[in-house]
Amino acid sequence: MTQKIDYFFGLGSPWAYVGLDAFTALATAHLADIVPHVIPVIEENGGIYSRNRPPLRRAYWFTDLKRWANRRGVTLEFAGREALSDIAPAGDLVVAAWLRGDDWLALARAFHQAFWGRAEDIGAADVRARITTEAGLDSVSLEAFAKGPEVAARKAESLEIARKAGVFGLPSYIVVGELFWGQDSLPFLDSHLKGEKLIA
């Protein structure tokens, strides 16, 4: 039977970007279906945005992020990020792509690479359109669909699913009720999908 992985992430999460290729390779190896849920950090469940952490913890977070980026072979660009606009519309396009049966994963990867790898302003309509087109999707129709009720309903549904499942930080992965938080938990997710016992 095909296994399903509920994948909770946001384009604003550098950890989702850093772990994306490793996660998708894992899912492919297990022939698992990925069900995407584009959500924010859930503070009521204990999630903490990096900007709200104490300076020393934030400094360590930054160092660890760079370590993992190097380990995963991905580029991070932090210069000029303060000028970037709201990326929520780009996330809506990813949701829209999934709902329409388009290649949402290619689009999410393209947005991640643009936002975190090159510090592009994916909140800008013209930048979104270019990236969407380069990912092989129809940017005009997708933008129109993303503004519709189906996408709003799906976002609300995903957030409620995440809240009830105990998701707090991003990325998170759930397989049959078992929650794994963070891209550094992928080895545990791999073992779980193999049917291995993780807790004695």
Question: What do these predicted ranges mean?
Answer:
Residues 11, 17-115:
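Structural alpha/beta surface segment adjacent to cysteine/selenocysteine redox centers
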Residues 1-3, 74:
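Generic structural motif recognizing short loop/turn segments at the entrances and edges of beta-strands
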Residues 3-6, 12-32, 106, 110-200:
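C-terminal cap of thioredoxin/glutaredoxin-like
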